[in-house]
UniProtKB/Swiss-Prot annotation:
Role: Catalyzes the reversible hydration of cis-homoaconitate to (2R,3S)-homoisocitrate, a step in the alpha-aminoadipate pathway for lysine biosynthesis.
Molecular function GO terms recorded: 4 iron, 4 sulfur cluster binding; homoaconitate hydratase activity; metal ion binding
Name by which UniProt lists this protein: Homoaconitase, mitochondrial
Pathway entry: Amino-acid biosynthesis; L-lysine biosynthesis via AAA pathway; L-alpha-aminoadipate from 2-oxoglutarate: step 3/5
Gene3D superfamilies for the chain: Aconitase, domain 3, Aconitase, domain 4
Keywords annotated in UniProt: Amino-acid biosynthesis, Iron, Iron-sulfur, Lyase, Lysine biosynthesis, Metal-binding, Mitochondrion, Transit peptide
Family affiliation: Belongs to the aconitase/IPM isomerase family.
Pfam families recorded: Aconitase (PF00330), Aconitase_C (PF00694)
Species classification: Eukaryota, Fungi, Dikarya, Ascomycota, Saccharomycotina
Subcellular location, record wording: Mitochondrion
UniProt main location, coarse: mitochondrion
Bound cofactor: record note: Binds 1 [4Fe-4S] cluster per subunit.
Transit peptide: 1-17
EC class (word): lyase
Amino acid sequence: MVVLRRSFHVYTRLQRGQNLTEKIVQQYSVGLAPGKRVHSGDYVSIKPAHVMSHDNSWPVALKFMNLGARTVKDPRQIVNTLDHDIQNKSDKNLTKYRNIESFAKKHGIDFYPAGRGIGHQIMVEEGYAFPLNLTVASDSHSNTYGGMGALGTPVVRTDAAAIWATGQTWWQIPPVAQVEFKGKLHESVSGKDIIVALCGVFNKDQVLNHAIEFTGDAIKHLPVDFRLTIANMTTEWGALSGLFPVDDTLINWYKNRLNIVGPNHPRINETTIKNLEDKAKVFKADSDAVYAKKLVIDLSTLTHYVSGPNSVKVSNTVQDLARDNIKINKAYLVSCTNARLSDLESAAKVVCPTGDLSKVNKVADGVEFYFAAASSEIEKEAAEKGIWQALLAAGCKPLPSGCGPCIGLGAGLLEPGEVGISATNRNFKGRMGSKDALAYLASPAVVAASAVLGRIGSPAEVWGIEDVKSSGLLAEELACNTETSTATPVSEGSAAKVEMLEGFPEEIVGELVLCDADNVNTDGIYPGKYTYQDDVSRETMAQVCMENYDGEFGSKANAGDILVSGFNFGTGSSREQAATSLLAKGINLVVAGSFSNTFSRNSINNALLTLEIPTLVEKLRSKFENAPKELTRRTGWFLKWDVPNAKVYVTEGSPDGQVLLEQKVGELGKNLQEIIIKGGLEGWVKSQL
């Protein structure tokens, strides 16, 4: 049983402090006005400490070269790794790998070849994702770096190319959710159980497109490996980052790391660790920092949790699923989520609890158990400790250090009708093989136990001991007033106006056209059948815009209108035409309750403006609640965006009509204005070369 309690807090401070996310962004923002403090909602230009790309490095390089760039801005900022398709030995893939390596060598970029490990793990081991820095990657699991106390967040390929060329890109600081851990985990319960439970309990998009900061006394008891797993799967939870604090546990991890990397490592050495210790003492969230919401979970009430099938939003205790006698065909211990040394050791303790290889618990008949280390370094250490040999003795099948089945590549994929259980991060239908297979996610110990039992079950069953008991998972949600916390009012005297660039309008005004639906996807905005037709004219793009959502959109919406829609607008694929087709229609601003992060990035990158105003969406829905249903509705309401004062006004009847809503919004700084003026990120990059 899950106990959910909900209460609300309203913040009315005229000025406020910064949370840890905002403080880190402040450090890595460029072009800020003197004295400017950044907050959630603000658009900022960022110069991240590092940017990682993996097998997609060659597409990024092609974008980079197509921009007209000749040399990278700062080779020390860039990291190239090969990890996704390393089992593919085709000429085409090997040529791509050679191209990436050649490009990296030419430009002096740090390069890690196939077999060295998964890019995110390399970023951790080699100190690129260092505590209190901002590190990005053109991969959705960049959130992983939050386990090291670094702010990690994903970017799209165009952003990566821009960073290569100019050293910077842009970011809109998301609302920040605070997640507090209380209590202490039972033995054998892991970080994977925590995040699987969180995804299943708080499964109503509570943290969608939020940055997360983990807090609470319980964190000191969580090993770094647990933190990395939790941060990694904040992606599946819907968040844009998952940041843990810097504490003694993390500092000691780095001190122990010195014994492996040696005293002369460029990023992990006595000097960097001492500087981190000093900085961490003072670099903390302010006491009056604002959070969009707060979630609390009592770890002492947690047992082993399993998500699925085919969804991270569905989770059950392993005891409940064990009673259902769910037979499995395949098990997996791979990926950037759970293939570190402690994960392999956890599985080895299930298959070989005594350490005697002659007394191992064999993988059940009819089950294939695939495993790989997150890096070659981990594989070597696992072999030195006998962990690797124990898994082999149990009948597990080794794979090279890479992504493999997690991304649906290489050996061991799920076949039609099969059931798999995996220590990876995604169990979407078809992700790990056939769309007609069922996939569950669990901790390494539960995966290993299930492989031995031949069905989903717990380590305690294999060991013949009493299982971890829980009287019910305790969790609560404390939600701030969204309007106040994400857009705190400021007095006229305390708020400096946004500096405006010549050529950018101080006011953006238009009539609101309502497409009243949540989760309007990219195929609804721009039909997939046109996506890979490179000769579609701008006029045709305008005609087909939103046709899969509503065939009447084209006749109802006019150039100069402002489109307003529901929550999670632009979900789905990464096609840039979802943004450019709206521009072709003459719509330069989209307002929604919330946006898909990828759509938001593609919008700014192509000079389409967006604003999140959930209050407006609710007001419109209330206004037309009893009106005849229309997929596209001309509302008769107008929106004016006062850009210098970062405010919006919604009026009725005309731009000068009765004010129905006045609200503060995020500031659009001059760096972002310049991107829009240049026609998008690519145009801006070209202007900088």
